[in-house]
Amino acid sequence: MIAVCAAKFVGYVCKKMGRQGVTWAGKVAIKICPDILEQLSSQVQKAIFATCGTNGKTTTNNMLCAALEAEGQKVICNHTGSNMLNGVVAAFVLASKWNGKIDADYACIEADEASTRHIFPRIKPDYMLLTNLFRDQLDRYGEIDITMNILEEMMRKVPKMQIIVNGDDALSAYLAMDSGNPYVTYGISKPVIKSAANEIREGRFCKRCGEKLEYRFYHYSQLGDYYCPKCGFARPKPDFDAEDVKVGDQLSFCVEGKHIVANYKGFYNVYNILACLLYTSDAADEE
């Protein structure tokens, strides 16, 4: 396949020159063969995972890839965080053979939220993880509602895609619950750390009726146990619920009767690990 050969050559040259050649390889490939991503991604044998959200994308995506590889699975992954169209194309191209053939059980793809418009219709993910939606997005897209509208549209365009969502984030949970797609949730049902009163909170108002949300408690930012006093929209009961969470030099918690200990710091990594566990559990149930 000419597109694959040309892209691999570009990637090799850029690497030799000490430059990051990943996105250039993808750009060349899609210029020569506009449907190359469809051709390559369709060869993934078991499932394609797509990870989106303001925070935790790269960590969770790489964590999932490592977990699958530890089980002996062959995985395509955009490890470097090149999460726009060219970077995703490059991940598939560089994982393929010179003839365009791919031998992979899974693909773990981190996707920029705005770029899902160009990525999802091509790869049609089997699973989509939505980690959270924070103010970060406002710097690039103007309004967080724009990001939500894009993701909502992509959920409709891939109706069989199962959504794995952080139920502690009202914005993310709203998207999943109103999407019509199958979805599962993860969360932390008891307060663990003290949340600052002056933190910026994006999900202050109910996306269904506009009423100000009430919170039984916050974890941090807008993550917590929320409910709408007017229409009844509320945090869903998590399918995967982290209990007995301890934060220190290591993280530890219990989920589904298992005690998890991880060499990570930072409370937010409990969410990343939970998402990864739910990803792999859900995929295993489908096999």
For each feature predicted by the language model, list its residue ranges.
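Phosphate-binding loop of NTP-binding sites
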Residues: I2-G187, S195-F205, L278-Y279
